[in-house]
Amino acid sequence: DEDEDILVKIQKEIGHKNALSHYSQEIDIGDKHYTSHTSRLIISSQKMVEDLEKFGIVKNKSNILNIKIEDIPEEFFFDFLRGIIDGDGCISFTVGGTCNLTITTSTIMAEILNEKIKLIYGKSKFYLTHRHKEVLENATLQATNKHFIYQILERTYKNANIYLNRKYNKYLDYKQYYETHFKKS
């Protein structure tokens, strides 16, 4: 599992001693056969569950997502956003071409995130779309403004120590590209 690195970081951060669990699953899609490898960090802490539930983070959260974002202290908002980008986001750009930051989540969470960004920056350059018009519960927040994307990613990854390596590396690539081509000294 290429994303196992974040589980190891979380495991170290909370002092969890149990080993990660590893799973393989055979998947057939059309005439293609795949083997999916997954890693899990299993934590059995009722206190941690209760603490997370206070913020609306519950089992099957992607479908329910009842986060009370106003209860998240502002100094932790970008850590929270990093978790969302790592889990359900995409950072993409082409040299000399387009830049995109997308987050796919519930429509309610997309609206809440967009409002929080507006409160912090005075406006938001994210726009909300529904990729599947028949599924209005899910939405995509997308930003294409290279300066806005840079601002968001800089605050999101500044002083971060827990992140998905592949997303962090994408951020570093974008940062270098942006600072080389667009940032004014």
Residue spans for each PLM region:
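Internal intein/HINT superfamily modules and their associated LAGLIDADG
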Residues: 1-185
